[in-house]
Amino acid sequence: LRRAQLKQLSILEEIDRICRKHDIKYWLDGGTLLGAVRHGGFIPWDDDIDIAMTLDDSRRFAEIAPKELRSGLVLQTPETENTREPIMKVRDLNSFYVEGNEDFSLDYSKGLFVDIFPFIPYPNVSRSFCKRYGKAMSKCYSILHHSHQYSWRATFELFYFGAKYLFCKSVWAAAFALRKCDTYISNVLINNGYGIMHRRDCVFPLSTIEFEGKRFAAPADPDAYLSDLYRNYMQVPPKEKQKVHAVFILPDLIEEAEVKK
């Protein structure tokens, strides 16, 4: 696991280099930010890295990164590959990473990666409303995008959750139209988005934080940011809950010494 973490750290360093060069703002997100605050680096059992960017900056990064990334790394997006998740990743091509719900019927790169989540302004609605909405959207997306075998139940699920998904989207569009969007920010709601909002002033202006002995961009107020996500985030979970996401990790398909020959 440690070899995989160090390879992911090198991907993050490359992203940081490109972002600094082109003035693209990003920040550590999710479990990666939690690891930085609580452990000074990776959560010991964590096997991925999460960062966030505003939607505009993520689009700029998507344009620039393919020309800037070092050899052996690739930018993976829903537009470039038929991916399982509709988010952007920087993948390492000399590794193999398999999650329990990986779809081997789809042809996409499955190396170690850094997730890049796009963030947008959110309407000024209550946090409870946003969380209920996010969970409903997440469930609908999950049902609609997993493989179905033909049956009356599957047909019913597609129609029911399809209609519910469209209804939720219309409610969310109405919230954007009727409320100001100057207080909160969060990730674009996708299959793993749960509608957790952050105040803009706890994200911007960005700060820096130490992660594995190096400094990376972080939210302005990591405590408030992590409290939104995890509440009592400094409490280490019991051993039985300290689980990796992957079911199989191969940090190097070809030994690095052979690659350099």
Protein language model features and the residues they cover:
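A short secondary-structure junction signal
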Residues: 125-132
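A contiguous, mid-domain pocket- or channel-lining segment that forms the substrate-recognition surface
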Residues: 137
